[in-house]
């Protein structure tokens, strides 16, 4: 089976992006998986922030997850890639007005201070994940949004996984070109061939 989802405030989903948090999006994802996939084995596929949420799911579904495929996953990006790089003026504005329009890597984000604070409750780099899973991360060499060192740090916290970090030579952050998607499909298929039957979640 295959389950794809958008978080609230994304795409055609209900709500506003600025009302969401890492915690609320993680909870929403847990509910959908429990409702739609019951107790099936899972391969998680997460892109950018979705990679962060995917890693959060291990706490609940650790006995069911058999593989994780990250596409430029961005855990803790709110602190490391945003807050830490904001000027004091921007930080004061965000605290006072609760929102800030942030432009980064060709993308525009309406960031709430609540989202920043919530991100601090969802750290993953201070943890160790001792799960014997297949872990594959694809990261574009030309990614201007999430630096490759983030993916390398993720590889380190998954101690017992069968790990693979793939750097796509001309890839950007989205890795949405046909050849990139073909490579993604190939990597998922490689896991699929060893672990049937299960469900893919992305």
Where are the language model's segments positioned?
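Conserved alpha/beta-hydrolase
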Residues: 1-14
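Hydrolase active-site cap/lid region
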Residues: 63-111
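Gly/Ala-rich beta-loop-alpha elbow adjacent to hydrolase catalytic centers
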Residues: 46-54
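Acidic catalytic loop of the alpha/beta-hydrolase fold
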Residues: 142-146, 174-175
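Catalytic histidine-centered segment of alpha/beta-hydrolase-like enzymes
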Residues: 171-183
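Short beta-strand/loop motif that positions the catalytic acidic residue
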Residues: 131, 137-139, 143
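Short alpha-helix in the alpha/beta-hydrolase fold that links the catalytic acid
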Residues: 133, 147-156, 180
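Catalytic nucleophile-loop/oxyanion-hole region of alpha/beta-hydrolase
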Residues: 11-36
């Amino acid at each position: 089976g295959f389950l794809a989802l958008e978080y609230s405030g994304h795409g055609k989903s209900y709500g506003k992006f600025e009302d969401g948090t890492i915690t609320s999006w993680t909870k929403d994802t847990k509910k959908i998986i429990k409702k739609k996939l019951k107790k099936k084995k899972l391969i998680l596929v997460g892109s950018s922030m979705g990679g962060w949420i995917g890693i959060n799911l291990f706490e609940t579904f650790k006995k069911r997850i058999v593989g994780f495929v990250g596409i430029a996953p961005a855990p803790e990006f709110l602190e490391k890639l945003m807050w830490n790089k904001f000027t004091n003026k921007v930080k004061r504005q965000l605290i006072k007005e609760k929102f800030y329009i942030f432009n980064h890597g060709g993308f525009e984000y309406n960031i709430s201070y609540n989202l920043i604070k919530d991100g601090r409750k969802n750290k993953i780099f201070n943890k160790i994940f001792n799960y014997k899973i297949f872990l594959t991360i694809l990261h574009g060499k030309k990614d201007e949004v999430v630096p490759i060192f983030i993916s390398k740090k993720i590889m380190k916290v998954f101690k017992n996984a069968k790990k693979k970090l793939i750097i796509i030579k001309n890839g950007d952050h989205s890795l949405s070109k046909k050849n990139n998607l073909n490579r993604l499909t190939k990597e998922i298929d490689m896991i699929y061939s060893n672990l049937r039957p299960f469900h893919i979640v992305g």
